[in-house]
Amino acid sequence: MLAFNFKKFLQSGQYSDVEFSIKPEMFPISKMFKAHRQLLALRNEVFAAMFYGPLPEKDVVVITDLHPDGFYGLLKYLYTGKPKIKSTEEAMYTRTAADKYLEPYLALTCSEYISAHVTAEQVCHVIDYTLLTGGEYVDNAVGRLLEDRPEAILASDAFTDCLQETVHFVLEKVTNVPEMYVVLAVHRWAQAFCQKIATTGNKPVDIKTAIAPFLAKLRFLALTPEEFVTFNTSDDTRDVLCKDDAFAIMSVILCNKSIELPSWACKERKPRCSDTKMSGC
């Protein structure tokens, strides 16, 4: 711990002798921070090597792999000796910076904050960020919420706007939720994806193409006949499955016979509310 709090010098930039230009490639945001070489070098071995090693950095250091809020969270910790996290987003970004600059206590504190504060509405943001940054694991709290608050997660704006890889992750982990709820949530994601593509000027994508990557993870056989008929006849969803595929699935739901299913179809009939793992897909 520091005997003196140097945060005021971080905030004011007084006596600074180096600048950090944070320009992350994956975020549309950039920021400059003024800092002090000797203080950073005394507090952190990575900065010591950076500023006083064989190839010292110049007066402006450009960083492209960290969010500005995360780098500032690291600086606050080094200047004050105390981790101070105020939001789940800040905890995610700061943990990445802590890992990069070898500050395990700060990284642990960030993980503990996420576990204690992440909400169902934030789950997909956490998964998105973890996948984007190549994280090796998703926080345990996310897994718990996928079991305890599945409907809130699937109904969240974060799910509708998340990465395709995050949708796959959720479909592999989510439990304790009616399958029809899952199917409709994925359909909403696909609709939003089509709308986003339309605003980029790229070639339009139809709903059938957008939802296709996830069909193999949807348990259509776990739906009731009424639910499946509703899905295939409603104005919004009736064009998702071709007639032959829909007929084959409906035949299995009704007759429970060994009728040949489409090659992509998930063969799991068990509802997600009755188990904790997908199997047979």
Regions found by a protein language model. Name each.
Residues 1-37, 41, 76-88:
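N-terminal BTB/POZ boundary and linker segment
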Residues 10-15, 28-30, 34-35, 42, ...:
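Eukaryote-biased feature marking scaffold/signaling PDZ-domain proteins and nuclear chromatin regulators
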Residues 14-16, 148-281:
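Eukaryotic cytosolic interaction/assembly regions at protein N-termini and domain boundaries
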Residues 45-60:
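Cytochrome P450 catalytic domain signature, combining two hallmark sequence patches
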Residues 53, 63-66, 84-86:
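Short, charge-rich binding segments
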Residues 73, 79-168, 172, 199:
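Post-BTB helical module
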